[in-house]
C-alpha cells in the first residue's frame, strides 16, 4: 500500500455504495474519515412517515468500525429545512413537480458538507458513493456519467461547480452496482445485503401522499377533460404530476373508451386537474421546453445555438435536441421529435455523449402546434 498523505471525508449514508467508497479510498492510501449527515429531524407525531436515520447511523458506525476509520456525526437539519425543504414545498404549492435530490446535492452535499469538510475538518477532498466519473483536461474538471448506465447519477449532480468538482472523489463511478456489492460481500461489510434506498431523501416512498397532506394545505376539486367535461374528483393538486396515469380513479367512465387517462395540466386558479386519454395524446406532447435557473459545469457559449441530448427526468432516455437562447438567463430546448410528459419544476440535464454539460429547471413546456 502506498501513502498519499491526503485526508478525505466520505459522506457515509449507511448504505453499500458509501461503505465501499470508504474501503476503496483507504486501500489506496488516503487518510479516510467518514461523516454521517442528519438532514431531517424526526418528530414523534409523524415518525411513522419518515425514513428513520437511527438505523442508517448504526450501519454507518458499524462499517467505520470495520474499516477502523473515525465517523463524524453532523446535524444539517436546519440548513436542509431552509434551503431544500421549504423550496420543495413552495414548488408543490405552485403546481410544479420539484426534484429534492437535485436540491439536496446542490445545497447540502456539495455545499454545506463540502465546506464543513474542507474548512472545518481540513480535508483535501470529499468523496461520495455517487455513480459518476470525473476527468481533468487542461486544468478543467469534467463530470461524466457513471459506467453503470442503470445507476448513473449525473442527472442529480449537474449543479456542481469547478471549485467543488476539483476536490471531489467518486471511487465507484467506474464500477457496476453488481461489482460494488461483490466487493462488499468479499470484504464482509455488514451492509453488503442492505437494500438500496428509494424515494425522496427525507421520506419513505409509500408515505408521500400523507407527508404532503401534513405540510401543505390542499382541497379536492374537479377532474376535467380537455373538452371541459367533469369526470371525477381529485384529492389535491399537489398529489399529481404531468403524465401521471395511476391513482386517478377515473377508469371505466360511461361514454368513454377504455384508453387510460393521463394528467396533461393543472389549473391552479380553478383547482382543476386536466386529463386526456392516451400516453401520446396531443395535449401531453411537447416539441420542446423553456428552462431557467441554468448551470453549466464548464464554460458554454449559449449566444450561439448548439446540439446535444437532454434528459427531462431521471429515468428517461436522452432526447436529441437543439439549444438556443430565449431570454436573459433562459434557454429554449427544441426536441428532435415530440416528447410526452414534460413536467415544469423538474430538471432538464444536457449531455454530449457521456459528458454532463449542466442543466436547468423546466419553466414551461412548448406544446405541439395544431
From Swiss-Prot:
Disulfide bonds join 104-201. GO terms for molecular function: ATP binding; tRNA binding; tRNA-uridine 2-sulfurtransferase activity. Residues 99-101 are annotated as: Interaction with target base in tRNA. Keywords: ATP-binding, Cytoplasm, Disulfide bond, Nucleotide-binding, RNA-binding, Transferase, tRNA processing, tRNA-binding. Pfam families: tRNA_Me_trans (PF03054), tRNA_Me_trans_C (PF20258), tRNA_Me_trans_M (PF20259). One of its GO terms (biological process) is tRNA wobble position uridine thiolation. The record marks 130, 346 as: Interaction with tRNA. It is found in: Cytoplasm. It catalyses: S-sulfanyl-L-cysteinyl-[protein] + uridine(34) in tRNA + AH2 + ATP = 2-thiouridine(34) in tRNA + L-cysteinyl-[protein] + A + AMP + diphosphate + H(+). InterPro entries: MnmA-like (IPR004506), MnmA-like_C (IPR046885), MnmA-like_central (IPR046884), MnmA-like_central_sf (IPR023382), Rossmann-like_a/b/a_fold (IPR014729). NCBIfam families: PRK00143.1, trmU. Catalyzes the 2-thiolation of uridine at the wobble position (U34) of tRNA(Lys), tRNA(Glu) and tRNA(Gln), leading to the formation of s(2)U34, the first step of tRNA-mnm(5)s(2)U34 synthesis. Sulfur is provided by IscS, via a sulfur-relay system. Binds ATP and its substrate tRNAs. Interacts with TusE. This is tRNA-specific 2-thiouridylase MnmA. It comes from Buchnera aphidicola subsp. Baizongia pistaciae (strain Bp). The gene is mnmA.
Amino acid at each position: 500500500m502506498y501513502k498519499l498523505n491526503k485526508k478525505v471525508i466520505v459522506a457515509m449514508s449507511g448504505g453499500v455504495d458509501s461503505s465501499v467508497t470508504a474501503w476503496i479510498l483507504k486501500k489506496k492510501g488516503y487518510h479516510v474519515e467518514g461523516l454521517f449527515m442528519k438532514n431531517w429531524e424526526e418528530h414523534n407525531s409523524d415518525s411513522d412517515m419518515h425514513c428513520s436515520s437511527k438505523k442508517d447511523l448504526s450501519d454507518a458506525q458499524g462499517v467505520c468500525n470495520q474499516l477502523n476509520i473515525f465517523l463524524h456525526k453532523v446535524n444539517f437539519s436546519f440548513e436542509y429545512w431552509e434551503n431544500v425543504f421549504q423550496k420543495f414545498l413552495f414548488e408543490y404549492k405552485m403546481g410544479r413537480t420539484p426534484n429534492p435530490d437535485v436540491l439536496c446535492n446542490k445545497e447540502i452535499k456539495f455545499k454545506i458538507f463540502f465546506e464543513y469538510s474542507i474548512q472545518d475538518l481540513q480535508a483535501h477532498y470529499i468523496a461520495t458513493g455517487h455513480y459518476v466519473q470525473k476527468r481533468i483536461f487542461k486544468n478543467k474538471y469534467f463530470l461524466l456519467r457513471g459506467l453503470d448506465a442503470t445507476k448513473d447519477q449525473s442527472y442529480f449532480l449537474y449543479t456542481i461547480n469547478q471549485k467543488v468538482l476539483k476536490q471531489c472523489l467518486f471511487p465507484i463511478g467506474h464500477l457496476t452496482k453488481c461489482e460494488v456489492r461483490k466487493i462488499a460481500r468479499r470484504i464482509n461489510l455488514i451492509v453488503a445485503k442492505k437494500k438500496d434506498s428509494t424515494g425522496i431523501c427525507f421520506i419513505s416512498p409509500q408515505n408521500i401522499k400523507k407527508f404532503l397532506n401534513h405540510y401543505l394545505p390542499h382541497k379536492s376539486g374537479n377532474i376535467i377533460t380537455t373538452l371541459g367535461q367533469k369526470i371525477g374528483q381529485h384529492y389535491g393538486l399537489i398529489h399529481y404530476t404531468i403524465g401521471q396515469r395511476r391513482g386517478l380513479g377515473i377508469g371505466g367512465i360511461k361514454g368513454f373508451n377504455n384508453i387510460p387517462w393521463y394528467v396533461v395540466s393543472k389549473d391552479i386558479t380553478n383547482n382543476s386537474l386536466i386529463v386526456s386519454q392516451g400516453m401520446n395524446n396531443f395535449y401531453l406532447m411537447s416539441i420542446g421546453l423553456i428552462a431557467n435557473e441554468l448551470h453549466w459545469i464548464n464554460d458554454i457559449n449559449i449566444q450561439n445555438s448548439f446540439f446535444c441530448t437532454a434528459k427531462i427526468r431521471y429515468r428517461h432516455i436522452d432526447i436529441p435536441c437543439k439549444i438556443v437562447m430565449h431570454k436573459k438567463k433562459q434557454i429554449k430546448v427544441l426536441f428532435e421529435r415530440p416528447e410526452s410528459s414534460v413536467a415544469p419544476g423538474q430538471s432538464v440535464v444536457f449531455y454530449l455523449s457521456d459528458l454532463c454539460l449542466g442543466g436547468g429547471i423546466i419553466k414551461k413546456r412548448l406544446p405541439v402546434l395544431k
